Design a protein with these regions (language model features):
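Flexible inter-domain connectors and hinge/loop segments
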Residues: 1-193
């Protein structure tokens, strides 16, 4: 479950698959999030397919908008690690992104103090304690160390993104083509020039 960091150490991209290094302990090319989503979606008769001749990954009938670095650029990205199949990460929008899922402590689980209605749900087991050291900067925390996202919550966002795309047609983030970015800059300059020139 590799995580891609942008130059400012913020997680904005979602790595779906890549060819593992020869000496890697983990030989699967697929991300943990993709494998969990695939297992869940199979029960909903939604298939994840990467055998498409174009090299795209499909969830059901929809193609994931993979980041295309062939031109060396993708939106604001230039000259970054472009290995594997990547999409932009569309976080769940909540006041506190660490609280978008139901969380149980191990004690609550063992003492059965909670309603154990786990049918048709994905359960991730992980550590959210500060001592775990598995925390990530996201666009939500803006460099504030005390608001970093635990790795297990980050995985929940990754899985949720794939499930919502496959089941609810939730749109994903993509970039405008290079030509449209240039057109927008020129249009803005022309507009400002006409208004204030």
């Amino acid at each position: 479950s590799d995580v891609l960091l942008d130059p400012d150490d913020v997680v904005r991209r979602h790595l779906l698959s890549m060819t593992p290094p020869l000496q890697s302990v983990c030989s699967t090319p697929y991300a943990f999030s993709l494998q969990i989503a695939n297992s869940y979606l199979k029960n909903k008769d939604v298939i994840i397919d990467d055998d498409d001749d174009s090299g795209n990954i499909k969830i059901g009938d929809s193609i994931l908008p993979l980041i295309n670095f062939e031109s060396g650029r993708f939106g604001g990205y230039q000259n970054i690690d472009a290995q594997g199949y990547q999409i932009m990460l569309n976080y769940r929008s909540y006041y506190n992104p660490n609280e978008f899922i139901e969380r149980l402590t191990l004690t609550d689980f063992l003492e059965s103090e909670v309603n154990m209605n786990l049918e048709d749900r994905i359960v991730l087991v992980g550590v959210t304690a500060d001592s775990a050291g598995d925390f990530w900067d996201t666009p939500y925390n803006s460099g504030q160390a005390d608001n970093r996202m635990p790795g297990v919550i980050l995985q929940a966002h990754l899985i949720s993104q794939l499930l919502s795309f496959g089941l609810d047609d939730r749109p994903l983030i993509s970039a405008l083509p290079d030509w449209s970015s240039s057109s927008m800059v020129w249009s803005t300059c022309l507009g400002w020039g006409l208004l204030f020139g």
